[in-house]
Design a protein with these regions (language model features):
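Terminal, low-structured helical/coil segments at or just beyond the last alpha-helical repeat
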Residues: 72-110
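Short N-proximal segments of mature Sec-exported proteins
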Residues: 3, 40-47, 53, 57-68
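Structural signature of tandem alpha-helical TPR/SEL1-like repeats
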Residues: 17-29, 53-61, 88-92
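Hydrophobic face of amphipathic alpha-helices that form TPR/SEL1-like repeat modules
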Residues: 3-12, 16, 26, 41-48, ...
């Protein structure tokens, strides 16, 4: 939870200099521990390209995981971004989410 809170601070420049790459690093650490809010925010970073290279497949994967872990925005955002993706990319993202989840977040597409 602390990693997630610090990531939000980095993303928004609250009490620290704004640092999107730093936020992404912390979101990823929290996301890999199953934090659904961090998974959602990491997906937003992938979708927007803030702090890393834009990647809709990775965004879809993390939103899928966030949704599975109880973050309602994850499902909403996943479905929205899917409208701009090919079926092949959606299938890839779903398979990656399954592998990530089944590996206890050890194999998450990077």
């Amino acid at each position: 939870k602390a990693q997630y809170i610090l990531a939000v601070m980095y993303e928004n420049g609250e009490g620290v200099s704004q640092n999107y790459a730093g936020a992404v690093k912390l979101y990823r650490l929290a996301a890999e521990q199953g934090n659904a809010e961090a998974q959602n925010n990491l997906a937003v970073s992938y979708a927007t390209g803030k702090g890393l290279i834009q990647d809709y497949v990775m965004a879809h994967m993390w939103w899928n995981l966030a949704n599975a872990n109880g973050n309602k925005n994850g499902g909403i955002n996943r479905d929205r971004i899917a409208e701009d993706m090919t079926n092949a990319d959606i299938e890839k993202a779903v398979a990656m989410a399954q592998e990530c989840f089944n590996s206890a977040y050890a194999k998450c597409g990077y």
